[in-house]
Amino acid sequence: MKKKIESYQGAAGGWGAVKSVANAVRKQMDIRQDVIAMFDMNKPEGFDCPGCAWPDPKHSASFDICENGAKAIAWEVTDKQVNASFFAQNTVQSLLTWGDHELEAAGRLTQPLKYDAVSDCYKPLSWQQAFDEIGARLQSYSDPNQVEFYTSGRTSNEAAFLYQLFAREYGSNNFPDCSNMCHEPTSVGLAASIGVGKGTVLLEDFEKCDLVICIGHNPGTNHPRMLTSLRALVKRGAKMIAINPLQERGLERFTAPQNPFEMLTNSETQLASAYYNVRIGGDMALLKGMMRLLIERDDAASAAGRPSLLDDEFIQTHTVGFDELRRDVLNSEWKDIERISGLSQTQIAELADAYAAAERTIICYGMGITQHEHGTQNVQQLVNLLLMKGNIGKPGAGICPLRGHSNVQGDRTVGITEKPSVEFLARLGERYGFTPPHVPGHAAIASMQAICTGQARALICMGGNFALAMPDREASAVPLTQLDLAVHVATKLNRSHLLTARHSYILPVLGRSEIDMQKSGAQAVTVEDSMSMIHASRGVLKPAGVMLKSECAVVAGIAQATLPQSVVAWEYLVEDYDRIRNDIEAVLPEFADYNQRIRHPGGFHLINAAAERRWMTPSGKANFITSKGLLEDPSSAFNSKLVMATVRSHDQYNTTIYGMDDRYRGVFGQRDVVFMSAKQAKICRVKNGERVNLIALTPDGKRSSRRMDRLKVVIYPMADRSLVTYFPESNHMLTLDNHDPLSGIPGYKSIPVELEPSN
């Protein structure tokens, strides 16, 4: 693997994407049998991409798949296996020395495993023995709240519903979830602002908008199929404006791999009409600057007798809180706005002009907005900006959070939440004849804190790589090994499985692409995308191993062993997933006619009240919510000279690392790098390719013991005073305390650091 830093000149997509897909297929898949499965991905009679949550178009191409979707499916259907012979040759201690890419690249897990401390190896056991032993451990705890039930966004609606049902019959609301680490500020912030913790737009709105503002996200890597929608809106004359600390190729220009003319002529579509490199942590200042200009110009228009710039009728009829927001915004000083955002008043005025001129605007955002200690307030400032011109609840306009995992939103909808509503618990209890717990449980941060303090005794993970994804893994690694029980439901080996508890189990499950055969026949599961579309997913491939079970079957097996007097007919439900969906419909009325509607091509849309201008808030209206000050992250209040954000590489999806390249950013064969601007490199007196150390700072500006040594400097077009490193390697640079008090999300995108040359 050749290591090099070399500027990538191509557009997003294009032949670079085709070559990358070919390499992934060649390395992982049986080309004769498995490649054909790609033609069934994102199709009504096929399976949903296990990657991002971007919705499927109504009229899709015959090959509706993106580069990273292809990597995800190649990773899943690999013919490599991690079985008993693998563990006979590799102790847990030796595997801990492997890289995270190497661990998952070893192949698919194909049989149930139990950790044996004497040999330091995982050893196979039968499914029933695994269920019985896990059930016995869970029965032994005096308090159900000593167990943490983690969920990954790859889990289907059906499995997630059974999982929360089991945990609540057991007696716990402890549901740490991957959404706690990515879009919890969306769920909390949007719910407070507009009454619904989800986005308000549909894919069709991109066909009607005048302007799309993309802020704090990177579609070329994280949701590449979005590029097709951005290309289409630009082609018809609408505008897209990008706001991001780094220049990301997927926001700049795109060659559509499915467009023969562009591929044969190496032509491309320019996406962003303007690109603003806001400083890391400067989004709130920028947004308040835009709102201040809009209000001042609206006042001037009113004084001159010209038409209002804002939607006064909408504000008067549908909102509360505008006067307080107005006072706050007008009191924001320009010198502070410019200093914190890194943008001039002139640049912010250009943005305000573009927004004012557009009749219908969509704002798309990702974790660059949410992963801050004031991430919830960031989201609410985006809503404030949209509300000022009535851009919620009309065609071609709205808020568009870009979720990560393909069903992270669906899991939450069907009950994976530590704070369930009274109504949900009442309907759940009525359906099954038991009283669910009403005391709020743990989200991700509280869950890990409970593990670190010894309050938690067991951790069950429905997918994911919990230990690696969380902050401060050095502090949490030892407490994880001191748990009494750890159960990992997984398709591939990862680092969390190697932090073994007193009793540790790995339970292998089917992938999204594989046939799920139950007593009534082959089953379909359902997922919810970022735009609240529910659709079916049916595996088409032969399972990687004969012992694999579905997630639903695994949950039912553990539940039956743990709760022998359960009021739930677990086996009956798993025999036919239509029965699970009937129960979901009974508990959640918005799923009316569930089984009928998922059999329609494309599925159905869950009604979004805010998109219809029905505000399910205590005030009965949409709320302008003021955030005091301009700082996204109080831990940077001492005016740190450098702020670091963690990001994915292009060969990565969440904690899964497909390869060591980051093509669009020009990094190949390595991940031990730090990105900075040429201006910042000059200030720090370092050059491209030199090695430096980063030291995390405490809230009072002092050097901590958390550090990253010998990172290679990559000079890159981006904002100054901003550094970027890769997730999850840099997660240890923040502590469990560095989180948003409103949503609990860790501040992965604003870590104050100090830089020094390496010896």
Curated annotation (Swiss-Prot):
Entries under CDD domains matching the protein: MopB_CT_ydeP, MopB_ydeP
Keywords of the record: 4Fe-4S, Iron, Iron-sulfur, Metal-binding, Molybdenum, Oxidoreductase
Pfam families: Molybdopterin
Annotated GO CC locations: membrane
InterPro entries, per database record: Asp_de-COase-like_dom_sf, MopB_CT_YdeP, Mopterin_OxRdtase, Mopterin_OxRdtse_a_bac, Prok_molybdopt-oxidoreductase, YdeP_MopB
Cofactor detail note: Binds 1 [4Fe-4S] cluster. Binds 1 molybdenum-bis(molybdopterin guanine dinucleotide) (Mo-bis-MGD) cofactor per subunit.
Functional description taken from the UniProt entry: Probably involved in acid resistance.
Membership in a protein family: Belongs to the prokaryotic molybdopterin-containing oxidoreductase family.
Protein name, as recorded: Protein YdeP
Taxonomic source organism: Escherichia coli O157:H7
